[in-house]
Amino acid sequence: MRINPTTSSPVVSTLEEKNLGRIAQIIGPVLDVVFPPGKMPNIYNALVVKGRDTVGQQINVTCEVQQLLGNNRVRAVAMSATDGLMRGMEVIDTGAPLSVPVGGATLGRIFNVLGEPVDNLGPVDTRTTSPIHRSAPAFIQLDTKLSIFETGIKVVDLLAPYRRGGKIGLFGGAGVGKTVLIMELINNIAKAHGGVSVFGGVGERTREGNDLYMEMKESGVINEKNIAESKVALVYGQMNEPPGARMRVGLTALTMAEYFRDVNEQDVLLFIDNIFRFVQAGSEVSALLGRMPSAVGYQPTLSTEMGSLQERITSTKEGSITSIQAVYVPADDLTDPAPATTFAHLDATTVLSRVLAAKGIYPAVDPLDSTSTMLQPRIVGEEHYETAQRVKQTSQRYKELQDIIAILGLDELSEEDRLTVARARKIERFLSQPFFVAEVFTGSPGKYVGLAETIRGFQLILSGELDGLPEQAFYLVGNIDEATAKAMNLEVESKLKK
């Protein structure tokens, strides 16, 4: 972190201005720049190209040094479009990595990768800035407390609980509900959460970013009347941005979150949607830099890049960062190098299933694939652990019996297995839940279900007390009392039809 003089734009001192280079080559978003002998910029230094294009339009492109090629030449990646750049244009070495505004001034605002506001609400106070490239906290600074982070979503809290100050991944293919789930988590957690949140939109749809901004204004997380009282900072580098911006926007969001943790000593929520796009952008840049591709065409530095980002997302003795990251799974293949590399860094994984989504069960969280390091009796307690294990056992048995049911039918099963199937189908439906952010699509009001209520509901299903209720009574309800009330309504409706 550094304190800048009062100014509304980054200052390039006269000393740094003397270190000038010239563009020698432009290959899409990658520039080769020649500097005078002995004045080579460091790796990750920010370079600024200023000038005018052929029609006289002002150009201001920031790049980041990636390679020193020899012969006084460096290769840099542009953070914005390179349209209008020409060979021979002047390039200024700023002498430092890219720095972005941090602190209270960022709350309620939308930024791009360079830390520039893009919400038309005027300039941001840039007296306090921080470089986006930093080392992870030292081992002795880390905090090891274990506590549960309640989300109000039944399937998450029961089967794969989140750790406060931990890293959580939401895995799923295209169109199974990752962004809706992350928006519901923002709605449930950010509203109740006393600290601040930072949202990093990495390579996702601009429309979703706009929807989220509107949602936050409506819910009061962003206070339009008094921006300073807002609880969230938004950083967007969406699908239409060059790969350099998509590769670095996650670091910009993380830098803002680190300031709240280290300097303000707050508990921070960091949402990243989508971490796969960070890897994808790195893959594009890697190819442009001339590196030999690795497995499935990914960059050979995949593990290093992911590690340098993920190791900074951690809890220290000053404060915590709880990170929730959406992870796109290409072709629904969890063994793809991008999701497989991400798995290693997470405390909890919430895996979304296309099979459940096809059945209309939302959130489409797979109860057997989702895992958490927190699901241990010494952390969550015996009652919670036992209930979760019995739910998983029942679901697993139902999965094993599905082939037999498909070939021979339910009637060929033993009495015990038929009972297991009936309870498993009720559990499957009870794991669905109406979301606050999906009220527009479903027409059902959203429900927040506390952990104690969730455990009680599943215990009643497993004990057999609710065997007489129809399974549709458990679909898209909140707690178990709503399911019993829905069953009574269904019974009344069926009698009226007769």
UniProtKB/Swiss-Prot annotation:
Keywords: ATP synthesis, ATP-binding, CF(1), Chloroplast, Hydrogen ion transport, Ion transport, Membrane, Nucleotide-binding, Plastid, Thylakoid, Translocase, Transport. InterPro entries: AAA+_ATPase (IPR003593), ATP-synt_VA_C (IPR055190), ATP_synth_F1_bsu (IPR005722), ATPase_a/bsu_AS (IPR020003), ATPase_alpha/beta_chains (IPR050053), ATPase_F1/V1/A1_a/bsu_N (IPR004100), ATPase_F1/V1/A1_a/bsu_N_sf (IPR036121), ATPase_F1/V1/A1_a/bsu_nucl-bd (IPR000194). It catalyses: ATP + H2O + 4 H(+)(in) = ADP + phosphate + 5 H(+)(out). It is found in: Plastid, Chloroplast thylakoid membrane. GO terms for molecular function: ATP binding; ATP hydrolysis activity; proton-transporting ATP synthase activity, rotational mechanism. Signal peptide: none annotated. Its main location: plastid. Its EC number is 7.1.2.2. GO terms for biological process: proton motive force-driven mitochondrial ATP synthesis. PANTHER family: ATP SYNTHASE (PTHR15184), ATP SYNTHASE SUBUNIT BETA, MITOCHONDRIAL (PTHR15184:SF71). Produces ATP from ADP in the presence of a proton gradient across the membrane. The catalytic sites are hosted primarily by the beta subunits. Belongs to the ATPase alpha/beta chains family. This is ATP synthase subunit beta, chloroplastic. It comes from Balaka seemannii.
